C-alpha cells in the first residue's frame, strides 16, 4: 500500500511541478491520515491546473479566430478601395488638362486653391479607414450612406482621406459634463457629425450649411472641450465668438452657457445698445466671450478685453457679417489674436450659409490649411423640411384679410406651444401690423426702432409662448433659433431672395417640419425668377400664377452695382490749416 501511495505521489508531482512538497510527503512514515489529507489537497491542485490549461487553450483559439476575421475584413476593404480608384486613363486625361492650364500661365492664389479643394472634396468624400476615429466604427457602408444622404462634401488640403462623421453622442471624445449637456438632443445634425472630428483634432474648419442646422453646438462643444484641456489660466478670454447681430449673440451665449453648467467656466455676451461699462466688468475673468463686431472692437481698444491668449476663434454667420459691412472690424479683431502663421496657437472656425467670394478671401487670409465641409450646396438653398406656399395676390390691399384668415385657422388648429412668425419689410409697417393684430390676437413685435430691452422682452415673450405671434422685420430673420415655430408668413416680400431663404428658415429647423406662406404681388415680380428657382430646388409646388411674371433671373448684384470691381481706395489725407 505504501508503494502504491508513493507511485501516486510521483504521478501528481509530474503534473503539478511541486518537488519540494512531494519530497516532504515521501519522508513521512506511517501517518495515514496525514497522507490522505495531503492526497486530497494535491488532487484539487491537479484539477485546478488542468482547468487553467483548458481556459488558456480556449483563449488562444479565440484569438486565432479573431485574427483570421480581421485579415479577411482588411483584404475585403483593400479590394473595395482598389475598385474605387480611378483608371490610369483618367489620370492621363487629368494630367493633360493640367498641362494645358500651365501653358495658359494661370497662377493659383491661396484663395483659389481653397475653392479647387472644395470641388475635389465633393468627389472624394469617402470615409478613411486610417482616420483618428475609425476604430469606433464597424459599419463602413452606413457612413457612406449617411454622407450621400446628407450630401456632405469634404475638402482637406492636407489629406485625401476624410475623418468619419460622429453619428452618436456616445462616440464624442469629450468630458462627461459636456456630454450631459447634450442629453436633450436626439442625435448630431449633419454639420455637427461632419465637423466634430476635425474640430476636436484642432484643425481649422470652414463649415457651410443651411440655416437651422445646429452650427452653434457644432462649434460650441469643441470650444468647451478645448477649455477643459487647458491646465493654465482660464480667467482670460480663450474662446472668442463673433456674431453679426445682438439677437444671435445672445442666443449663442444662452446655448453655450447651458453647456457649461456645473463647470468653473464663465461666458459673457457683449453687444451694442447696452451699457458698455457693465459689459466690461462682466468680461473680467471670463474664458468665453461672445459679441457683435462693433462692441467687441470697442472693448478691445479700451483694454477691457485682452485677446492675446485666444486659442479658439469663431466667426458665426460669416457671410452675413461681410454683407453688412463688418469686414474691416473683423480684420481688426482678428489682428489682436495670436497669429497661427507666426507660431501662434489659434484655431479658427468659420461657419456660414453660403461661400461667396468675400468669405473665401477672408478664409484664405486667416485660416491655416482649413478643412472645408459643405452640407448640401455652397449656394443658399431652402430646407426641404419646409413646405413653401406662395399666394399670388393681384390686390396688395387683400393682405390684411388673408393674414387674419390664416391666423384664425392656424391658432385654432395648432398645438398649444406652436408659434407663428410674421415678416414685414419696414419698421413702420411692423408697428402698424402689430397694432392691427393686437385687437384680436396676443401678439408682440420686434424692429429696429425699439430699444434693446424692449426687443429682448418681446423675443422672450415669443419664445416662452406667452405671445404666440411675433411680427418682425428682417432683424430677426438670421440665425435665431426659436423652438416650435410652425408657421412663417411673409406679408411683404424681402428685398433679396437670400433674405427670403433666411426668413423661412426660422421654421423647419433641426430636422423638424414647418410651413412658410408668402404673399406675392405684382410689385414683387422682379423676384419671380429667383423664387421659382428656390421652389424648384427644394422640390416644392410652383403656382402657375408665378410664371406670368416671367422666370428670368438678373445677374448677381452686390450693394455697389452689377459688377464686382475691386477699386483701390487711397487713405484719407489729413488736412492741416495754418
UniProtKB/Swiss-Prot annotation:
Protein's UniProt keywords contain Transport: no
PROSITE patterns registered for this protein in UniProt: DEAD_ATP_HELICASE, HELICASE_ATP_BIND_1, HELICASE_CTER, Q_MOTIF
Listed Basic and acidic residues bias regions: 59-69, 86-95
Residue ranges of every copy of the Helicase C-terminal domain listed in the record: 402-550
GO molecular function: ATP binding; ATP hydrolysis activity; mRNA binding; RNA helicase activity
GO cellular component: nucleolus
Protein name (database record): ATP-dependent RNA helicase dbp3
Organism of provenance: Schizosaccharomyces pombe (strain 972 / ATCC 24843)
Amino acid at each position: 500500500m505504501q508503494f502504491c501511495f508513493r507511485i501516486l505521489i510521483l504521478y501528481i508531482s509530474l503534473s503539478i511541478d511541486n518537488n519540494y512538497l512531494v519530497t516532504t510527503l515521501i519522508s513521512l512514515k506511517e501517518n495515514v491520515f496525514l497522507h490522505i489529507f495531503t492526497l486530497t489537497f494535491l488532487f484539487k491542485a491537479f484539477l485546478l491546473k488542468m482547468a487553467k490549461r483548458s481556459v488558456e487553450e480556449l483563449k488562444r483559439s479565440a484569438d486565432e479566430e479573431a485574427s483570421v476575421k480581421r485579415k479577411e475584413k482588411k483584404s475585403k476593404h483593400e479590394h473595395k478601395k482598389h475598385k474605387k480608384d480611378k483608371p490610369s486613363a483618367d489620370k492621363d486625361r487629368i494630367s493633360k488638362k493640367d498641362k494645358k492650364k500651365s501653358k495658359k500661365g494661370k497662377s493659383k492664389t491661396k484663395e483659389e486653391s481653397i475653392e479647387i479643394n472644395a470641388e475635389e472634396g465633393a468627389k472624394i468624400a469617402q470615409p478613411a479607414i486610417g482616420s483618428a476615429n475609425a476604430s469606433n466604427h464597424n459599419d463602413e457602408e452606413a457612413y457612406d450612406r449617411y454622407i450621400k444622404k446628407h450630401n456632405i462634401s469634404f475638402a482637406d488640403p492636407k489629406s485625401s482621406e476624410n475623418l468619419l462623421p460622429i453619428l452618436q453622442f456616445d462616440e464624442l471624445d469629450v468630458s462627461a459634463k459636456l456630454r450631459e449637456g447634450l442629453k436633450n438632443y436626439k442625435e448630431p445634425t449633419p454639420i455637427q457629425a461632419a465637423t466634430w472630428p476635425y474640430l476636436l483634432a484642432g484643425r481649422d474648419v470652414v463649415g457651410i450649411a443651411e440655416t437651422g442646422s445646429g452650427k452653434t453646438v457644432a462649434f460650441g462643444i469643441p470650444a468647451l472641450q478645448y477649455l477643459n484641456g487647458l491646465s493654465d489660466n482660464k480667467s482670460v478670454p480663450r474662446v472668442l465668438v463673433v456674431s453679426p447681430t445682438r439677437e444671435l449673440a445672445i442666443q449663442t451665449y444662452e446655448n453655450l452657457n447651458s453647456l457649461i453648467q456645473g463647470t468653473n467656466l464663465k461666458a459673457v455676451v457683449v453687444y451694442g445698445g447696452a451699457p458698455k461699462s457693465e459689459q466690461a466688468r462682466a468680461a473680467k475673468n471670463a474664458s468665453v466671450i461672445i459679441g457683435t463686431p462693433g462692441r467687441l472692437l470697442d472693448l478691445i481698444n479700451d483694454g477691457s478685453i485682452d485677446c492675446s491668449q485666444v486659442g479658439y476663434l469663431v466667426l458665426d454667420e460669416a457671410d452675413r457679417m461681410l454683407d453688412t459691412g463688418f469686414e474691416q472690424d473683423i480684420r481688426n479683431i482678428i489682428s489682436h489674436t495670436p497669429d497661427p502663421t507666426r507660431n501662434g496657437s489659434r484655431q479658427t472656425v468659420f461657419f456660414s450659409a453660403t461661400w461667396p467670394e468675400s468669405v473665401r478671401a477672408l478664409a484664405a487670409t486667416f485660416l491655416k490649411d482649413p478643412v472645408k465641409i459643405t452640407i448640401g450646396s455652397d449656394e443658399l438653398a431652402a430646407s426641404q423640411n419646409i413646405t413653401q406656399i406662395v399666394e399670388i395676390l393681384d390686390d396688395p390691399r387683400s393682405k390684411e384679410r388673408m393674414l387674419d384668415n390664416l391666423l384664425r385657422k392656424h391658432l385654432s388648429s395648432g398645438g398649444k406651444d406652436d408659434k407663428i412668425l410674421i415678416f414685414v419689410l419696414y419698421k413702420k409697417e411692423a408697428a402698424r401690423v402689430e397694432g392691427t393684430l393686437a385687437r384680436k390676437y396676443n401678439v408682440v413685435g420686434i424692429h429696429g426702432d425699439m430699444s434693446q430691452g424692449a426687443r429682448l422682452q418681446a423675443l422672450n415673450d415669443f419664445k416662452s409662448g406667452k405671445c404666440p405671434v411675433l411680427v418682425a422685420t428682417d432683424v430677426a430673420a438670421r440665425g435665431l433659433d426659436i423652438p416650435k415655430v410652425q408657421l412663417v408668413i411673409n406679408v411683404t416680400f424681402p428685398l433679396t431672395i437670400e433674405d427670403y431663404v433666411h426668413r423661412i428658415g426660422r421654421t423647419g429647423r433641426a430636422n423638424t417640419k414647418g410651413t412658410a406662406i408668402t404673399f406675392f404681388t405684382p410689385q414683387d415680380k422682379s423676384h419671380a425668377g429667383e423664387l421659382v428657382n428656390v421652389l424648384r430646388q427644394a422640390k416644392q409646388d410652383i403656382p402657375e400664377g408665378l410664371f406670368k411674371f416671367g422666370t428670368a433671373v438678373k445677374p448677381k448684384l452686390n450693394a455697389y452695382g452689377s459688377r464686382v470691381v475691386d477699386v483701390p481706395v487711397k487713405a484719407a489725407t489729413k488736412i492741416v490749416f495754418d
